[in-house]
């Protein structure tokens, strides 16, 4: 994985089992690897993922060719082009943690941006998610804190909560995933 973390498939499975019903239409605007799309489609849902990197999209679509999972190569900011309002049942994402892991050298890759620009783009993209979900549906955002060059938290967790609430979501729950020491990418 070239030093980039991979989403925990058990976490993807649990979130799918807890927050969806078979046949739900799920989506992710920072799709990244194949894990969530593969898991949720294997469990009987339809998945749409937006992923910035063409090579990752191609790989994901190849891995999911026999499943109801489709990855679109585009910027998360263009969510309105690909997903209609009030059309989805579940949103799941594990967005870039600012510059903690660098995914590509693309100019519009959030992992290449200074923190102020990251939060501006992140807020715009995430702010569009609420309108895509049908009423009484859930969103799961997997985030953790990131430190700046001075060792201070950049407030990714509280800013994500604020962004989601400002766009219309109710802060329903918080789940803490405890990782074993030494499992994160270096």
Residue ranges, per PLM feature:
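Class I S-adenosyl-L-methionine-dependent methyltransferase catalytic core
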Residues: 1-186
């Amino acid at each position: 994985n070239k030093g980039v973390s991979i989403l925990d498939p058990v976490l993807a499975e649990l979130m799918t089992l807890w927050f969806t019903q078979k046949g739900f239409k799920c989506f992710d605007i920072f799709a990244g690897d194949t894990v969530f799309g593969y898991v949720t489609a294997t469990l009987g849902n339809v998945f749409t993922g937006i992923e910035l990197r063409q090579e990752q999209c191609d790989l994901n679509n190849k891995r999911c060719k026999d499943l109801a999972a489709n990855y679109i190569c585009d910027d998360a900011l263009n969510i309105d082009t690909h997903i209609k309002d009030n059309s989805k049942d579940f949103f799941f994402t594990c967005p870039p943690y600012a510059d903690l892991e660098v995914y590509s050298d693309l100019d519009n890759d959030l992992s290449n941006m200074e923190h102020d620009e990251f939060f501006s783009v992140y807020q715009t993209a995430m702010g569009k998610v609420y309108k895509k979900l049908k009423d009484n549906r859930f969103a799961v955002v997997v985030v953790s804190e990131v430190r700046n060059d001075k060792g201070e938290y950049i407030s990714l967790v509280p800013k994500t909560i604020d962004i989601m609430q400002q766009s219309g979501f109710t802060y329903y729950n918080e789940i803490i995933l405890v990782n074993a020491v030494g499992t994160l990418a270096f």
